[in-house]
Amino acid sequence: MIGVTVTVKLQNKLAKDSIIMSLKNVSQYLFTEERGLLLRCFTNVSDTQVDMFHLWKDKSYQLQTRKEFSTKFWKDIIEMGGVVSLIEGKCEVEMSSFINSSLVKI
C-alpha cells in the first residue's frame, strides 16, 4: 500500500472548503476496485489549511490517478496562489479491534 499526505494552504476558508468539496465530488470514482483508493482523511488544521491522507492499494493506482487528475488539479491550486506540499511512501496499516476487519478488503 502507498500512503500520500497532501498539505494545502489557501488564501481563505472559502477556497479551502471549495477544494475539499471538489475532491469529495470525485471520491466515488476513486473508491472503486479499478481506481484503488482505499481511504481518504481530511484534517482541518485551520480556516485556510487542510491536510489530506490518501491510502492507495498500490503505487500503480496512485500513479494512474496522478497522471489523469491530480497533477493538473494541484498545479491549478498553486496557480491560484495556494501552497501544496506532498509526501508519500510505502504504508503499513494497523486497525482498531473496533473495526470489523472481515468487512475491510485491503
Residue ranges and their predicted role:
Residues M1-V50, L55-T71, I78-I106:
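Short S/T/G/P-rich N-terminal loop/turn motif that feeds into the first structured element of a domain
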